[in-house]
Amino acid sequence: MKFKQDFFTQLPEFYSQVYPQGITKPEWLAWSDDAAQLIGLSQPTDELLLGLSGNAAVDGATYYAQVYSGHQFGGYTPRLGDGRSIILGEAIGPNGAWDVALKGGGPTPYSRRGDGRAVMRSAVREFLVSEALHHLHVPTTRALAVIGSDLPVWRESQETAAITVRLARSHIRFGHFEFFCHSERGRADKLIQLLNFTITQHYPHLSCDAAGYKAWFLQVVQDTAKMIAHWQAVGFAHGVMNTDNMSILGDSFDFGPFAFLDTFQEDFICNHSDPEGRYAFGQQPGIGLWNLQRLAQALTPVIPSDDLIAILNQYQEALVQPYLRLMRAKLGLSAVDVPSVEQDKQDLDLIGRFTVLMEKNQLDYTQTWRQLGKLDPTSKHSALRDDFIDVSQFDTWYQAYQQRLGAVADIPAWQTERNSVNPKYILRNYLAQEAIIAVEEGNLAPLHLLQKILTQPFAEHAEHEDLAKRPPDWGQGLIMSCSS
């Protein structure tokens, strides 16, 4: 790997230098070939294993943990920072630079009495969801590898430590800006320094002046809205949408008790620590705006409040338009040639009525969409009909759907197109749990198979139909904890 160290050299007050503590008996548990290509790597090697497990220095790495703050479950925490993630620097790849971070690399000045470690189950989950989201075309950070060990760590019980090697276009979060506005009051100079660095590194087409700052914030609003639109379309619940878990680039970030929907449930809660459902699936669009409002507050020393409010008012449209594009594709609806508020409203109503029917009939979100690939959209009798208990309500919806759909000239091509946007396979929590149990027993095959399937989620994989099934009773609606 070749590194540059722009964050390290240009923002010395934004981190603490800290070196990883190696894990014992490191071994490769998982590796992503296409993530490796992002930073110019090919195959895992013994030398790389030593370096990324913290047992040897990596040439060109500088090792640091970033400081930031954030709103967690609605309350402001003035000092957070990387409590168990150590960044090596920005690795230069063929198409840009990616931060390389060792998540679980050991304690840092921001560990808050924690051990700085990650357990194997959380490392595997982060790796798998990074692979899954990327191949579902959802903006996300990536995971290069999972490195296991025999190092014992204690959570609710004894587990073993592991490291996720995370790749991110940037680790700058909403919380970085909050820290230098609220926690370090009077440091507007540092806020501007961070803002200029972010624009120079990631938005080079913008200028570092008043006009550029406003254009940048609008881009952040749009990118955040687009990310959440993808989440809602694919049925992904993040679970911990604190502002310190929000990437400034609109990439899905910092995965913990996430889940993909099994049975469609608008108020689905995937986080055991969120009993009131602040971060429930259906709340994510609103929380996205709330988090952007907190970021806007932090930017008031730099951008006038009236301008910030005007930009925030564009969030709804920035969310609805990509969501409509994604959902129209899932349903096979033709794109709207001339934007129409009335047509958007009608399509949103059609989509909403369909998901309400899914919830009332307790249907699997992913499987129901996939069924469209078997549908003859010209037939009065839908193959979907048998899945619905309340067939009269479905018939009413289906009639409206056919009317909006219009004529379909090539039915096989239409069906193939539906299968290209409606995945057959998602990372169901129970599948991740089964892979984790197998790893604990020394069997990596289920993990590697699941990874393979998740990198081709739209393919049939007829020999692995079992991985597309609804979860068994024990795996239905699994709720995870933040313990990791």
Swiss-Prot record:
One Pfam family named in its UniProt record: SelO
Binding site for Mg(2+): 245, 254
A GO molecular-function annotation: ATP binding
TM spans (from-to): none
Top EC group: transferase
Swiss-Prot/TrEMBL cofactor(s): Mg(2+); Mn(2+)
E.C. no: 2.7.7.-, 2.7.7.108
Catalysed conversion reaction: L-seryl-[protein] + ATP = 3-O-(5'-adenylyl)-L-seryl-[protein] + diphosphate; L-threonyl-[protein] + ATP = 3-O-(5'-adenylyl)-L-threonyl-[protein] + diphosphate; L-tyrosyl-[protein] + ATP = O-(5'-adenylyl)-L-tyrosyl-[protein] + diphosphate; L-histidyl-[protein] + UTP = N(tele)-(5'-uridylyl)-L-histidyl-[protein] + diphosphate
Function: Nucleotidyltransferase involved in the post-translational modification of proteins. It can catalyze the addition of adenosine monophosphate (AMP) or uridine monophosphate (UMP) to a protein, resulting in modifications known as AMPylation and UMPylation.
Superkingdom of the source species: Bacteria
Binding locations of ATP: 81, 83-84, 103, 115-116, 166, 173, 254
Record has ATP-binding as a keyword: yes
Keywords (A to Z) from UniProt: ATP-binding, Magnesium, Manganese, Metal-binding, Nucleotide-binding, Nucleotidyltransferase, Transferase
Protein name, entry field: Protein nucleotidyltransferase YdiU
UniProt-annotated catalytic positions: 244 (proton acceptor)
Tagged with keyword Nuclease: no
Family the UniProt entry places it in: Belongs to the SELO family.
Family matches, as InterPro entries: SelO (IPR003846)
